[in-house]
């Protein structure tokens, strides 16, 4: 995403000793009981909490609508630095973000932050975005879609504002793209900036019992995010109005490929934005699973290809942790992904 990355990393001091070549949260944590505070598994750096997302069955996050339909959400993550010398992706798997707010809507949060020119911006966003979204008024009692979207927009704005202040004082120059998911009750919100992507696997029909009918049939892959690159007309227009130049290589000022990101303070004056696109949908029996991935994953997997790969493994009865690991392994070892590669697989089950 950023050419001449070495020019931008001279003043940063990332701690990469925790970034293994290949990683899943299953490798790090064991089953835990429900914590008194929000349980988080976060990766790509020194702040790795020793709690997991495989709780006892009665403690797993589920979401109940007014019709009392209940969905179990299982998720896990895997990462690999690929051919890169350092790992600049970080991630969050927060299966129950509502434990700090008793009596509120059940909430889950998942995110991938893909750093470029370093990992400081990605780490900052991981630590602050979710809290800023909550502080901005993410609904906790009665779901209001407009209010939720407004809170997400404000959370992104506030996070980037604070990051830019920090980057000036700390001499940071790096940036990070993001793909984030919040699940409130049965409503799913997906927000992204840059080229990280979320793909939904949906069945074409359900039978009269409400069960999936995709057995033997491919699921439909639905891309829930929109890529933000400087070469795309809508993004190019904003950049040019801000005085930015798209070079012949398709990059802003000849260097930055993405047009929306956290950080990148030297490019903000040229129209780089941290305003996300937000997509919302309702969980029904047709939604099977989601795949969140950084651009490294999608460079070697098409959306339908990735959905088919995951569907096959899930039909074999493999746990979501194994599925996420195999997806990343396939991308890096078999398909020769050269970039950092991180994927979160989120499975929806009706119980």
From Swiss-Prot:
Enzyme Commission designation: 3.1.3.16
Keywords: Hydrolase, Magnesium, Manganese, Metal-binding, Protein phosphatase
One of the record's GO molecular function terms: protein serine/threonine phosphatase activity
Any matching Pfam family: PP2C
Cofactor: binding details: Binds 2 magnesium or manganese ions per subunit.
The keyword Hydrolase belongs to this UniProt entry's keyword annotation: yes
Binding site for Mn(2+) 1: 114-115
Residue span(s) of domain PPM-type phosphatase: 74-348
The keyword Metal-binding belongs to this UniProt entry's keyword annotation: yes
Binding site for Mn(2+) 2: 114, 295, 339
InterPro entries: PP2C, PPM-type-like_dom_sf, PPM-type_phosphatase-like_dom
Region ranges (Disordered): 1-63
Catalytic activity: O-phospho-L-seryl-[protein] + H2O = L-seryl-[protein] + phosphate; O-phospho-L-threonyl-[protein] + H2O = L-threonyl-[protein] + phosphate
Biased composition (Basic and acidic residues): 54-63
SUPFAM superfamilies: PP2C-like
Cofactor(s), names only, from the UniProt record: Mg(2+); Mn(2+)
Family that this chain belongs to: Belongs to the PP2C family.
Protein name per Swiss-Prot or TrEMBL: Probable protein phosphatase 2C 8
Organism: Arabidopsis thaliana
